Amino acid sequence: MPRDVDLFVLNQVIEHVPHPDRLLTMLANALSPGGHIVIETPNTGGLDARLFARRYWGGYHIPRHMVLFNERNLRTLVERSGMRVVETAHLASPAFWIQSLHHAASESRMAPLASLCTFRNVPLVALFAAFDIVRGRLTTTSNQRLVARLAT
């Protein structure tokens, strides 16, 4: 296989793949020297992931999300595929907050409030976007970006 690809972008993709290790190894083998892979994926280490982990976290997207990552296991997976992590970032994820609240409210005495927890509720989306932007500067969020470079 020629090593002639400079960049692969996996934007909310890797969690849908049954064998992400095989995918990353295949992509690493196609990268040109100095080539990069950018991965954005849910992060199970975010606050909402931990608060709603037992059942309601919006990032689960069962059955579509086959594999979920925290920062550590994503980094390990990338490094085992022959790449070096050069950058990580925490991204805002208001959608996961809204989905989590909607799921939790739907199955509780607060069910009437579930109808407020939608993406059409612009103030709620703005609130959680701002919350995650601040959190992302201080700690983790439930959405992450990792940039890796082919190790030479």
Task: State what each model feature region is.
Residues 38-40, 58, 116-121:
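N-terminal start-of-chain detector that recognizes signal peptides
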Residues 57-72:
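Acceptor-substrate binding/catalytic loop of class I
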Residues 1-52, 68-80, 144-152:
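Conserved SAM-binding loop
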Residues 87-152:
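A C-terminal cap/extension of S-adenosyl-L-methionine-dependent methyltransferases
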Residues 83:
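Short phosphate-binding/catalytic loops that engage adenosine nucleotides
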Residues 54-58, 138-139:
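Short, flexible turn/loop "capping" segments at secondary-structure junctions
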